[in-house]
Amino acid sequence: MDDEYMSLEEEEDNCYPSEFDDHDQMCSNAEESDLQHSREPTSQVITKEALVAAQKEVLVKVMEFLSVTENQARTLLIQYQWNVDKLFSVYTDQGKDVLFSRAGLTVFDPSLTKKTMKCDICMEEDLSKYAMTRMECGHRFCNDCWKEHFTVRINEGEGKRIRCMAYKCNTICDEARQLVSTELAEKFDRFLIESYVEDNNMVKWCPSTPHCGNAIRNIKDDGDVDEVECSCGLQFCFSCLSESHSPCSCLMWKLWKKKCEDESETVNWMTVNTKLCPKCSKPIQKRDGCNHMTCKCGQHFCWLCGQATGRDHSYSSIAGHSCGRYKEEKVRQLERAQRDLDRYTHYHYRYKAHIDSLKLEDKLKKSILKKAVLNSETKDQKVFKEYSWIIDAVNRLFRSRRILSYSYPFVFYMFGKELFKDDMSDEERNIKKNLFEDQQQQLEGNVERLSKILEEPFDEYDHEKVVEMMRHLTNLTAVVDNLCKEMYECIENELLGPLISGIHNIAPYRSKGIEQAAEFSASSACGSS
């Protein structure tokens, strides 16, 4: 054990930058970095039961500010995607008439109400006032026609914005529940409640499968990409609702997933390793050194040029056939396909290797926690009672391993020519690629060292050896944290920062991991929700 740690100390000069000598300073820097990104929770979990309260608080704010009914407030908020600041801005800058008009609201003028009790839809006359219903716009029709209108719209999924039946009236009718069956009324209310999530850019359903029923609300309305953890345990990107994929941008991750799932690389492999039969066009793979090929359909052809030939041949030639001119474009196409295939294989292999390591280390984490708990109960040493150091190390391993895995798709697109062909010269691309891969390699080496130390049977060590292991793990954990931080700074400032396009923003690095969304409480709701 001691000899092993001596060798580790000898390696530290190569793996540890000099500024990492002061461990307390490193931990302080990591905490300060997290505080810079978030001093308060930036997201909230809204349970299915709390959705009504979350929606109600925003409705009340609009109702009080504009002196409108709940129905009118909801219609306005749906129009402006539940963005109260935007709604108030339109009201302040352009007035109430413009605000109402855009949302399909009409101020009721009693003088325009017809005196006759006739329904202009079914043309039935002499109806009692109890058989007719007037909407906020002032238009009045019989209850049967309203019921039919509401029933059709609700069943067609248009319950959130049911317009008045009157000709050219765009007023939104919100009184459906009083005129339809109990079942449809519940469905209508569900549409209105869910609109708080589905029409709201700052609130999204947790993408868990099966669905946990929670929604996540982004408190800070700054447009930045962020990652969040729902109370159900799922971590995901709030912007694209995919799994957490930082340091990849949402577009990079979307393209990478598609590339891994579709047949683009299979096509490249087929181009490199097979030739199409000139008769039936089926792909043929070469298995030996002879250039004479025979398809199952009976067609003979030359492997080198793909042209149809006769049957007679020797190992070195085919009777009556000589390959034509050098087909430069076909050769270039073949070389390009081979190069693309090799490049994709290189990055995918490393991405997959780290994903597989994460799965194995999940078992390691459970084993370590079990050992730590058992030792804290059976041993009297202080170090076993306080084993947060090893939990911190395991969590750091998981966070850094995941960052490493997603850094390979990032490199694939950052330094390829699919997205940034015109953003960098070849020379600049190579320089930046080498610098980034140096950082990536340094992080990778320290992550593997962290993983190796965590595999040690610390539960079998005496007190002195455990203290020594704790010291090494604590230092290495801080090193890995700082390397992750430096990688993100490089990506944000040196790689993505100079680009003109702003579509490749990434979620910020957080030393303590992805933020767990706070529990929603009505008093904490903000106006821009």
UniProtKB/Swiss-Prot annotation:
Transmembrane segments: none annotated. It is an enzyme of class 2 (transferase). GO terms for cellular component: cytoplasm; ubiquitin ligase complex. Its EC number is 2.3.2.31. Zn(2+) 5 binds at C277, C280, C295, C297. The keyword Nucleus does not apply. This is Putative E3 ubiquitin-protein ligase ARI4. It comes from Arabidopsis thaliana (Mouse-ear cress).
